Amino acid sequence: MTEAAADPVSATWAALAALPRPTLAELFAQDGRVGQLAETLELPGGTIRFDWSKTHLDPAHLAAFERLAEATGFAQRRRALVAGEKVNVTEGRAAEHLAQRGIGAEASVEEAGSFHARMHMLVEAIHGGALGDVRHLIHIGIGGSALGPALALDALARDNPLVDVHVVANIDGCALEAAFEACDPQTTMIAVASKTFTTIETMTNAASALAWLEENGVTDPYGRVVALTAAPDKAVDWGVDETRILPFREAVGGRYSLWSSIGFPVALAIGWDEFAELLEGAAAMDRHFVETDGAANLPLRAAFADQLYTRLRGCQTRAVFAYDERLRLLPSYLQQLEMESNGKSVTADGLPVSGPTAPITWGGVGTDAQHAVFQLLHQGTVIAPVDFIAAIQPGDGLDPAHHRILLANCFAQGAALMAGKAADDPARSYPGDRPSATILVEELNAATLGALIAFHEHRTFANAVLMGINPFDQFGVELGKQIAGEIDRGGVRFDASTEALLEAAGIGG
C-alpha cells in the first residue's frame, strides 16, 4: 500500500488531481449547468444568489471535494468551532465570533448578550444627549478593529448618520489630522479599539487625540473616550472611566470582531436596531453553515472552488470586484480575513503544509477596475479566479440607467472571461475559459451585509479545514513589529541595507 493510499486526505487530493479538466464551454454544453452550480438563499433583508456555474466545478469535483471534507474532518471541526472548543490550537483558545451572533456555547452566547446590552445602553445614552452634544466620533483602531467598522460604515452609514464617524487606522499623522479637521472637538468623542490596549499605532493615535481635545479646551477629555477592548484593566490604567469601557472576550479574534464591542461606531452611526439587523443577517448565514452538509453548504462550496484553483490549478491570486460603490472596502476587508487567516506554511499540527495555502486576495470596485486591471484578467498570462459581487436594487436615487449600466458591465465581464473571442489579430484575441463566480444580493442593507461578511468568514474557515491549518492565529505579523520597536528604541544594529535606510531617513542610532 502506498503512503497516499494509507492517508485518506492525500488519496483524495490525488483523486482530485486525476479528474478530467473540461473547459467551461464543454461544461455549459451539458444540460442543467446553472441549476447545479447556482443557488439562492432566503435571508433576513432579502435574498443572495451564489453562482459558481462559470467555474470549473462539476459533479465529479463536487463529489470528490465532499470526500475531502469528510477526510479532513470538516464536520468535526465545525462542531468544535460552534461548541466553543479550543480550535485556535496554537494559542489554546476558542474562536467565539459566532457567539456574538447568538450561535454557540450557552455561556459564551449569554456573555456576548450582556456585552451587547452594555453597548446598547451607551449608544442610546449618547443618542439621547446624556453625554452632551455628540456629533462626531473618531474611531481609532487598526487591522480588524478598523477594517470591519470601516466597511460597515461605508456600506450602511453614507446618508444622514446619527453620528458622523471617522475611522483612523494608520500611524501616519496625516490620517489622524484629517479626522481632526473634519470634527469639532467640542462635539467629538474618541473610541479607542484595541484588543490588548497596547497596540502601538492605536495607543499613539489615541494619545494624540486626547491631546487634541485638551488643546482645544475640552475640560474632561477622558470623559470623551470610549474603550473597546478585551483588556479593560489596561483601559482603566490608561485613564478611561469604567462606565465608558465596552469589553469583549479575548477569544474573539480581531478580524472576526465586528460583531462585538468593536462594532460600537457602527451602532452609533446607524442606530441599534439596524446594528441588530447586521447581527441577525450574520446569524442567518451561521445557521445555514452549521445546519447544511456537503456541497449544499455554500461557504464550503466556495472553498471547494478556491481549492480547485489554488491547489489543483496553481492560481496564486483571487480577485474580488464589488460592482457597488458601497462595497468598495470589501476587497481590503477580505484581504485581512483571508490572508491573515490562511496565509500559513505549517499545519495546525505544526508540520509543513503539503501544498499551496491562501492565494493573494486583491480587487477593486466596478466599473473603475475595468479601466485598470481587466486587461490582465482577459489577456494576461496570469489566471486569477474572479468573484463579482453586486446588488439588484440600486443604492442611489438617480436615473435607473446608472444601475442598469453597472449591472450590465458586471455580468458582461463574467461572460467575456468565460467565452473569450477569437480574432485574426492575436492582439485582439481573448482566450476565454477564465473562471468567475457571481454573488448577487437582492438589496444591500444591514442584514444582507451581515450575511455576506459571515459567508466569507465561514468560507475562510472551510478553506482552512481543507488545508489542515489554523485560521485563528497570526504569528506572521509579529517579527516586523518587533524589529520596528527595536528601531524606534535604538541601540540595535541591522543589515547594511536597513542601516543605510535608517541613516538616509535620519532615524538611526
Question: Which residues are covered by each model-predicted region?
Answer:
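Glycine-rich phosphate-binding loops that contact phosphosugars or nucleotide phosphates
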Residues: 121-292, 486
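C-terminal structured subdomain/cap of oxidoreductase catalytic cores
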Residues: 446-495
